From Swiss-Prot, chain B:
This is Peroxisome assembly protein 12. InterPro entries: PEX12 (IPR017375), Pex_N (IPR006845), Znf_RING (IPR001841), Znf_RING/FYVE/PHD (IPR013083). PANTHER family: PEROXISOME ASSEMBLY PROTEIN 12 (PTHR12888:SF0), PEROXISOME ASSEMBLY PROTEIN 12 PEROXIN-12 (PTHR12888). Zn(2+) binds at residues 307, 310, 328, 331. Component of a retrotranslocation channel required for peroxisome organization by mediating export of the PEX5/prx-5 receptor from peroxisomes to the cytosol, thereby promoting PEX5/prx-5 recycling. The retrotranslocation channel is composed of PEX2/prx-2, PEX10/prx-10 and PEX12/prx-12; each subunit contributing transmembrane segments that coassemble into an open channel that specifically allows the passage of PEX5/prx-5 through the peroxisomal membrane. PEX12/prx-12 also regulates PEX5/prx-5 recycling by activating the E3 ubiquitin-protein ligase activity of PEX10/prx-10. It holds the Pfam family Pex2_Pex12. GO terms for biological process: nematode larval development; peroxisome organization; protein import into peroxisome matrix; protein monoubiquitination. Residues 53-56, 129-133, 282-359 are cytoplasmic. It is a multi-pass membrane protein. Pathway: Protein modification; protein ubiquitination. It comes from Caenorhabditis elegans. It is found in: Peroxisome membrane. Its main location: membrane. The chain crosses the membrane at residues 25-52, 57-81, 107-128, 134-184, 254-281. The gene is prx-12.
Length: 273, 359
């Protein structure tokens, strides 16, 4: 234990821990999705228990290494983190929320559920205030850490080590790509809309079309109860243009072309006897 | 999954590398994500080129799997021989070392096994998936009762067994990944076990070794023989040769940056940016106007349970969504297949527009 660690390292450790939890959960869900339907239904029913079991497996890392995976990544650990303290921490952090939520769900009584929601809301508010105090003044990053008097310490003295240019290059490229996308996206979108609109203006209904789909100019899917412009010939779904309140062509909005049902434009069909 | 890329940069940029430890699970998932991005990106590019220049690129588009496996073999072989890692592993600052000896797999059995697991197995798995989809569709159209002959029995056995094999492989991979997170395993995937290698971070000595120029190509190399004119010629050819040797590195580096951009685009579209571009119907839909659609009064005078085609009680109700009328399934299916339009309104239609009503 060299010295107390920074707040930003503790926050990064929490982010990494939650990311590891989601990776493990996604792996298990991926396997369950491949299984037959009755097995998947059983797993869906037992989802909270499965989640607690997975959490317990991940918490074994603290017993063997003295820190969580995220803390180990950030090279920090709690001072005096004994196995007994780890067990108590696990009980308060994982088991107590699971038991209270499960009991309120299984009891079926509305007043217990409502009381549980109130207690949860109060706890969330307390956590938020505690977190704001932590951001302002340091100290313990979560309420459970305050309860158990756990503080994060750096395992080694932080030094200015050799610069990893590969990682910095990737970080710089990531931010450069983000800035390029945010800068050019409006122009790309405007150009794309102009091209699409030009294509749609050329797409008109003619009686020579035999078996092709009539695509709606608004939703780009086959028209449901197609409406056609009386002069311009553009086709749209009834529901798509009904939202425009005045039943006019969405492409020729400046001319306010009225639309009618496509069926009225067609000649009478021949019924099979 | 896309936030894992950001987490890998967070973990690798901050943690000090005082000792050589195994890469974090975020780096590994990010490089696997980059590896799975190569093939769809190239396929999309080839499809785009085939659309504009059919004479040149259509054959490439049709046989994309075979062309891609050749390209992938060249790429991974180059990286395994020169950098001791696959293409995406090198991009994320990792290398492979043999489990027994601790040497890089530049030559020998580890490189062959690495090439098989990196290039061969994805190709085989893709072909097996396509075969499974095709056979499953065939046996759903026909029934299983028409099975006879050894080949058909083998095909049926394959259709039954392949999903279980895939599930087992995925379960093994998940278990190894969890063990890797908990530092109980040095490998995160069964394919690394088959290749006989483990992953490590690159060290500064490795980075210096990559940039080493061969001795006889260095500029300051003294030549003990020859005249001044011969010396100038030799130096010129050394520069040309050094440039040619450096060209694959430059091209592969640019290729890596392009793929990183693809990965970034995938990340952006899976997060908040996609929500800004989505458009949907909002507001209530008003009731339809009461207008006369057809002029045939006998259609409207029918009972609501009659079919407009056969004028009898409907069997297997089917709606035609281009007009909204409901018919017998056999009547409308036959009519649409014959005339390609709605019998009441005349709107163009095909069998894709039939909606079976199960009420």
């Amino acid at each position: 234990m060299a010295c107390r660690c920074l707040r930003v390292d503790q926050l990064d450790a929490h982010v990494l821990d939650s990311e590891i939890r989601s990776i493990a959960q996604d792996s298990v869900d991926d396997v369950v999705n491949q299984m037959p339907l009755w097995v998947a239904r059983i797993f869906e029913k037992l989802r909270p228990e499965l989640k607690v079991t997975l959490e317990a497996v991940l918490w074994t890392h603290r017993f063997s290494r003295g820190a969580s995976p995220g803390q180990e990544q950030m090279d920090i650990a709690y001072a005096g983190y004994t196995p007994k303290l780890i067990t108590s921490h696990f009980m308060v952090e994982v088991i107590v929320p699971y038991l209270t939520r499960r009991m309120s769900e299984l009891s079926g009584r509305i007043d217990i559920s409502r009381m549980y929601s109130k207690i949860e809301a109060i706890y969330e508010l307390g956590s938020l205030l505690h977190f704001l105090y932590f951001l302002r003044s340091g100290g313990h990053s979560t309420i459970t850490e305050s309860i158990f008097s756990l503080r994060n310490w750096n395992n080694h003295q932080p030094t200015i080590s050799s610069i990893n240019y590969d990682t910095q290059n990737r970080e710089l490229m990531w931010h450069a790509f983000r800035d390029v996308i945010l800068l050019t996206y409006p122009f790309i979108e405007k150009a794309r809309q102009r091209i699409v609109k030009k294509q749609k203006l050329d797409r008109k209904f003619t009686s020579s079309i035999g078996s092709s789909d009539i695509e709606c100019v608004v939703c780009d899917k086959p028209s449901v109860i197609p409406m056609v412009g009386q002069k311009c010939g553009h086709v749209a779904c009834y529901t798509c243009i009904a939202t425009s309140r005045n039943m006019t062509c969405p492409l020729c909005s400046e001319n306010a072309e009225p639309m009618e049902f496509l069926a009225k434009k067609l000649k009478n069909p021949i019924l099979i006897e | 999954m896309s936030t894992t890329i950001r987490a890998s940069q967070l973990a690798s940029s901050i943690s000090p590398k005082t000792e050589e430890k195994q890469p974090s699970v975020f780096d590994i998932i990010a490089q696997e994500n980059l590896a799975t991005s190569i093939r769809p990106a190239l396929q999309h590019l080839v499809k785009y080129l085939a659309f504009f220049k059919p004479k040149t690129f259509l054959s490439v588009h049709r046989n994309f799997d075979e062309y891609y496996i050749i390209f992938d073999l060249i790429l991974q072989n180059h990286y395994l021989r020169n950098y001791g890692a696959s293409f995406t592993e090198n991009f994320y600052s990792m290398k492979r070392i043999a489990s027994g000896t601790g040497n890089p797999p530049n030559d020998g059995r580890e490189r062959i096994m690495s090439l098989i697991t990196l290039v061969g197995w994805p190709y085989v798995e893709n072909k097996l998936n396509q075969l499974y989809d095709r056979l499953k569709e065939v046996y759903e159209c026909r029934s299983w009762s028409s099975i006879n002959g050894m080949k058909a029995k083998c095909q049926k056995m394959f259709v039954i067994i392949w999903p279980y094999i895939k599930t087992a492989l995925k379960a093994v991979k998940s278990a190894l990944q969890l063990a890797y997170i908990l530092n109980r395993s040095s490998i995160h995937s069964p394919w690394l076990y088959f290749s006989g290698v483990i992953l490590k971070h690159l060290t500064p000595e490795d980075l210096e070794a990559f940039n080493a120029v061969p001795l006889h190509l260095q500029t300051g190399y003294q030549i003990s023989r020859g005249t001044l004119n011969e010396h100038i010629h030799l130096r010129f050819f050394n520069r040309i040769w050094r440039f040619i040797l450096g060209l694959p590195g430059i091209v592969s580096r640019l290729f890596a940056y392009g793929l990183f951009f693809v990965q970034f685009l995938d990340y952006m579209y899976n997060t908040d940016l996609a929500k800004l571009t989505k458009t949907g119907l909002d507001g209530a839909i008003p009731s339809p106007p009461h207008k006369m659609i057809i002029s045939e009064s006998e259609i409207l005078s029918l009972d609501t349970n009659k079919c407009p085609i056969c004028l009898k009680k409907r069997v297997n109700d089917t709606a035609l969504f281009v007009s909204g009328y409901v018919f017998c399934y056999t009547c409308i299916n036959q009519y649409v297949n014959t005339y390609n339009k709605c019998p009441v309104t005349g709107c163009p239609a095909n069998v894709q527009h039939l909606i079976r009503l199960f009420v």
